């Protein structure tokens, strides 16, 4: 049983009889001497799909839910359903667009290292690698000699993700992106 301060994004907890996956954590420190940090967590109910906001003290003990992570790749999109195929036993996992709306911006058919989070045999979310490689679909033309400057410009990836990239990056370039911070890391190695 970890403390609330030890829980990370993507962790599944058992809270009030429901299995919830942590989507986002905001830490705040109240004014005054008394009390420790507060952790406001945006949680996703794996059964109903509803979003729940809860606040925990840093010392609150939370119960982890029983979950497994299965390595998988995006196989195809069927309307608002994304179908991932297990890399070991080829089991298909269907996830709704709403359940993985943030994560799907980093995933295409070539993305390696994606894990489907499975609770009680049902897929409930995605666990992304720390970085992914995507192709720049649209950006302003690159400027010759711009690699020495620190200016950036907006770019849209093939998945629809929008990030800032250095001026020397052009349309069609393959780049590495940090999935936690939504930031450009560098050109992908060929």
Curated annotation (Swiss-Prot):
Gene3D superfamilies: 2.30.30.30, Nucleic acid-binding proteins
InterPro entries: Elong-fact-P_C, NA-bd_OB-fold, Rib_uL2_dom2, Transl_elong_fac_P/YeiP, Transl_elong_KOW-like, Transl_elong_p-like_YeiP, Transl_elong_P/YeiP_cen, Transl_elong_P/YeiP_CS
Annotated protein name in UniProt: Elongation factor P-like protein
BP terms from Gene Ontology: peptide biosynthetic process
SMART domains from the UniProt entry: EFP, Elong-fact-P_C
Listed GO CC annotations: cytoplasm
Organism name: Pseudoalteromonas translucida (strain TAC 125)
Protein family: Belongs to the elongation factor P family.
GO molecular function: translation elongation factor activity
Pfam families (UniProt xref): EFP, EFP_N, Elong-fact-P_C
Recorded coiled-coil stretches: none
